[in-house]
Amino acid sequence: MKDTTVTAQFAIPAADWKVLAEKADLPKEAWGKPCFVAWTTTPWTLPSNVALCVGPKIEYDIIETYNPYDAEKLTLVMASSRVAAYLKPEGEITDGGELPPYERGDKYVPYRVVARLTGTELEGLHYRQLMPWVKPVEKTGELAPKFVNDYAAAHPEKVFTGEDGRDRFVEMESEAFRIILGDYVTTEDGTGIVHIAPTFGADDAKVARDADIPALYLISKKGETRPMVDLQGKYYTIDELDRNFVKACVNEKAYGHHAGDYVKNAYDPHFNPNGIWDKKASEKAEDLNIVICMEMKQEGTAFNIQKHVHNYPHCWRTDKPILY
């Protein structure tokens, strides 16, 4: 199937850039905004991102360039072998001179590679949450991983009880949004950096848990930990969520902008009149992936947006794309 994909910019905080710059023997002040870039075919999962995964032996370039949409100065990190997929060789500056200015619409984007590191050298660096709609949270107790209970014990101010008074949860924002290692990362496509959303994939869940990364769950009115997308294929509405969880972990304005939106048109009742899926109409209409990508472009967090043909699992009975 053909989907709208995005290569997202995950901003690197100043303190982590200084660590990265020291490893790469670069100035403490980055050229423009420093970012890790990661590609995804499912932009609707980006609000649930909690980590970025790199291959331990893969080489990664640090590149000074511009955002092709708004010409913002950027310092990017991506796999060395994937640079040519995003930046034309005609734009590379190799003589050590200053990058020429860039304006949107120019034939190519100027860039230069200033350093190269392995994935292992990137491990542990942090980045800013791309879409700070919801803070990561975990349920504490006997069945919780040790790192969750240890964190809750060390940070009692982060612990809260569900509105039904039964279960206790801990907000774990500080433990997420960092670079982790994964042997399954490849450089066949994308940037060589994988966006990790544990609630939407078994591989993501395993690599995150192995690295003590908390998941980004929502907590329902019933006190259940749930992915951001419900079983009808839409983002949960705020009134379906535990009030104490919302108070502790949800940016109501940011999340509320898309609360209740269907992540695939195939599940939207508008395209299922009388329970019959109008496949042609749903595929023709703009879907949430496109909306999210356009919002990212306006916010300056999208480095590349394009259509991509790929294999995606579908239900054999309804022919609809599978979400879980």
Where are these regions (language model features)?
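Non-cofactor substrate-recognition interfaces
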Residues: 16-36, 43-324
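A contiguous, basic/glycine-rich beta-loop/short-helix subdomain that forms a polymer-engagement track
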Residues: 3-7
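Short, ordered beta-strand-loop transition motifs
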Residues: 1-2, 31
